[in-house]
Regions:
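Active-site residues of response regulator receiver
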Residues: 53-54, 60
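A short, hydrophobic beta-strand element within the central beta-sheet of small alpha/beta folds
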Residues: 73-85, 98-99
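The feature encodes the CheY-like receiver
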Residues: 57-58, 71
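C-terminal output/effector regions of signal-responsive regulators
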Residues: 121-188
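Helix N-cap/capping motif at the beta->alpha junctions
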Residues: 14, 32-41, 61-63
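Active-site T/S-Asp motif of two-component receiver
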Residues: 50-53, 65
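Conserved acidic segment of CheY-like receiver
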Residues: 3-24, 50
Length: 188
């Protein structure tokens, strides 16, 4: 992630989009789109979080969400909608749901920050699991003496310990709901 995360705000109601942009622009790089089609033009790998209206006339938020997944983009998505959530949301691949009206800048800022923390947690967990797999492979093939004599193995152990601490710190910043969302599998 760059030093300042990039947030794409997508809503066909210009006053809402512009208000959200004002609330976030001091903390994040902000892009705005006033339609689903425009959102697709502004979406790229630099976008970290998308705040996406669910119902738009030209291309719905659900269609944009499908395209995000089809393109393999790794941004986090919060649906921001006046539509009360119903069971149909279970099939949608988003990370947060905000019900309009969102009239509190703090709620929007907190949502973006939480989504960014989840991204950090995912990245740290992937790195941790990759290193843990390497450590396990070495431990099954090398003798304890060889492991003890290896500077590379000791460095790996230290890196794993550091990552474990980072994961713990990041997880502390997430609440139970965030962690449930992290491990939710819609296919279950």
């Amino acid at each position: 992630m760059p030093d300042q995360a990039t947030v794409l705000i997508v809503d066909d109601e210009k006053p809402i989009t512009d208000a959200y942009a004002r609330w976030l622009e001091d903390d994040y790089q902000v892009r705005t789109a006033y339609s689903g089609s425009e959102a697709l033009e502004k979406l790229d790998d630099a976008v970290d979080v998308v705040l996406l209206d669910r119902r738009m006339p030209d291309l719905s938020g659900e269609d944009v969400l499908d395209r995000i997944h089809e393109q393999g983009l790794t941004c986090r998505v919060a649906l921001v909608s006046a539509v009360e959530p119903d069971f149909d949301i279970l099939e949608l691949g988003f990370d947060a749901y905000l019900e309009k009206p969102v009239s509190d800048a703090d709620e929007l800022l907190e949502t973006v920050e939480t989504l960014l923390q989840r991204t950090t947690y995912d990245s740290q967990m992937q790195q941790f699991l990759s290193l843990a797999t390497k450590k396990a492979a070495l431990e099954t093939k090398k003798s304890p003496e060889e492991l003890k004599a290896s500077e590379e193995y000791e460095s790996l152990r230290e890196e794993l310990a550091d990552l474990r601490a980072q994961l713990s710190d990041t997880a502390t910043g997430l609440d139970d709901e965030d962690l449930r969302a992290e491990f939710y599998d819609p296919s279950d």
